[in-house]
Each structure stands twice: as structure tokens, then as C-alpha cells.
Amino acid sequence: MTTNEAIKERASYRGKYLEEAVSRDNLEIIMEAGLAAPSGCNRQTTSIVAVDDSALLEQIRPLLKRVGMTAPALIFVLSEKIASYHGNCYSVQDYSAAIENMLLTITDLGYASCWVEGYMTDFKDGVGKQIAEILKIDPKFELVCCLPVGKPDEEIKRVAKKPFEERAWFNLGN
């Protein structure tokens, strides 16, 4: 699959997963893709934890809100707030680039996933903090995202994107 094909094929999958394990080799390929993403001033503020241990998965799954509850592997994205250009922090852009790299690699390897962030970082639910405690993550990191990974058990439904002409232009204003 080419990069462009992976971009067009990628879709958010919120269904059930087959019980088929994701190999450690493939998890490492996915994680390496995330770590290869660009970062502001090369601060490399993004770190990644993959969970494929059944005992840990059983502790974490009750905290997930349906999406990824049956995935054989979960990838958690961690962010460290480090100042870079003119003292600004670009960790959100850094981890977003890492997540997209991983989503494209997940698609390329024939797996499905979904970018799960909202309730991970929502202070009301505190799910990210609870998972970070289970995984004994250093407090200097914020757990910002979960990517369930596995073979889909259902058809992946792709949502139509708005037409190019509604969202992209050449030489706008000229």
C-alpha cells in the first residue's frame, strides 16, 4: 500500500475486534512510525506505551467507553510539555503528528483503530490519569490518547469527506 492509499483508506473504527493478537513486531513498527514524526524544534515531546498483556488489558478495558474494549492491543500516547520556539509549547502538534503516523501505519498493516482522546484528557472523567496509574507512567507525562489496534470484526464504515472545492483552494485572495 502506498502512503497515499493508506491516507485514503484510513478510517476511524469503533466496532468489535477479532481476538487475533497483534504481533510485537507490528506493534514496534507502529510505535516507530509515531516516534519518527516531526516535533517542534526537535524536542521529541511524544512517548508511546503499547499494552498487549492480557492482565493489564483486563484492568484497563473497564475504563474505556466502548471503543477499543475488545482490541487485542492498546497504544497509549504520552505528552511531555516542553517549551520550544520562543518559549512556546508545541506538544499538541507533536503528538498529533505521531498519532497520524501511527494511524496510517496501522492501516497499512491491515489493522483498524480510532483516535480516542476526548475522555482521556477530560478532567471530569479522569480516565487518562487512571490508566496512567495502572501503567505506572511517570507524572512528567500526560496520557493524551488511546489507539486500539486489531483486526476489525465488522465492516469499516467510511464517512464521506466534504468535496475538495469546499475545503481547499489555490491562491485564495488573488
Describe the predicted segments one by one.
Residues M1-N174:
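Acidic, surface-exposed loops and disordered segments
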